[in-house]
Amino acid sequence: MTNLRIGHGYDVHRLVRGRPLVLGGVAIPWEQGLDGHSDADVLTHAVMDALLGAVAAGDIGKLFPDDDAAYRNISSMLLLRRVAAYLAQVGYQVVNIDATLIAQAPKVAPYREVMRQNMADALGVNVTQISIKATTEEHLGFTGSGEGLAAHAVALVEKQ
């Protein structure tokens, strides 16, 4: 049996007024933010789900339930650190992450390197192990109409 395992994560959040927009641990100036129990960092949530999926540990809703007040407005970077600690506890390390943000706006290219570094720091890996891309849906669907943002992530982990 191989020591490598792969996981896929997907998350979506609605855009609303009166909330900050946090993506990859970066507060991005924008007229709307993402609605959610935590900071609603859709990109980091997809990454956490990919990591948890790779080790068959469920998803972030199982580990950090949205009906638990302890996680109200909590930083997803803090939760990502907890996921990293869990991976280490069960004997896995991150090989690489490949994440894609789906958003018509705002453009995230100016923030991409900081996002990568934030995730690398939280996971205790080199920034070269973190890939973050962004795309639009050409004004189609809920992300294209500006109703929300979505993210996919794939994680490769290795048993130690």
What residue spans do the PLM features occupy?
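Short acidic capping loops at alpha-helix termini that bridge into adjacent secondary structure
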Residues: 126-129
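C-terminal edge-of-domain segments
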Residues: 143-160
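RNase III-family endoribonuclease catalytic core
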Residues: 2-114, 122-123
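Pyridoxal 5′-phosphate
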Residues: 132-136
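Active-site phosphate/pyrophosphate- and oxyanion-stabilizing loops and adjacent acidic/basic residues
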Residues: 117
